[in-house]
């Protein structure tokens, strides 16, 4: 998925910002969270997050759900490099494995499992 944040900000500026953030807040992870383009889920009000390194993926999903005011019965999927990360994984380990060369971790979210195999509905 192409990041709008990357399109709007040149690489050197993004890299410098991520480095500044990591120096100032070494226990935090700079995350860019964007909606998957064709998803019908609500658009998030802010893209940039400073996430505690000991936060789990599940806790981060909870933060996103709150920001987009998603009702409990609605599904949300988050993707890192077009893969669903494990809910119990720490954001710090996801960051170390998947951070971009600019120093940010890019996460996309959707109301559908757009990159994995299709989920079948039970009748």
Curated annotation (Swiss-Prot):
GO cellular component labels: autophagosome membrane; cytoplasmic vesicle
Site (Cleavage): 116-117
GO BP terms, alphabetized: autophagy; protein transport
Protein location: Cytoplasmic vesicle, Autophagosome membrane; Vacuole membrane
Sequence similarity: Belongs to the ATG8 family.
Protein keywords: Autophagy, Cytoplasmic vesicle, Lipoprotein, Membrane, Protein transport, Transport, Ubl conjugation pathway, Vacuole
Propeptide intervals in chain numbering: 117-123
Protein name in the entry: Autophagy-related protein 8
Name of the gene this protein is made from: atg8
Function: Ubiquitin-like modifier involved in autophagosome formation. With atg4, mediates the delivery of the autophagosomes to the vacuole via the microtubule cytoskeleton. Required for selective autophagic degradation of the nucleus (nucleophagy) as well as for mitophagy which contributes to regulate mitochondrial quantity and quality by eliminating the mitochondria to a basal level to fulfill cellular energy requirements and preventing excess ROS production. Participates also in membrane fusion events that take place in the early secretory pathway.
Keyword Transport found: yes
A Pfam family annotated for this UniProt entry: ATG8
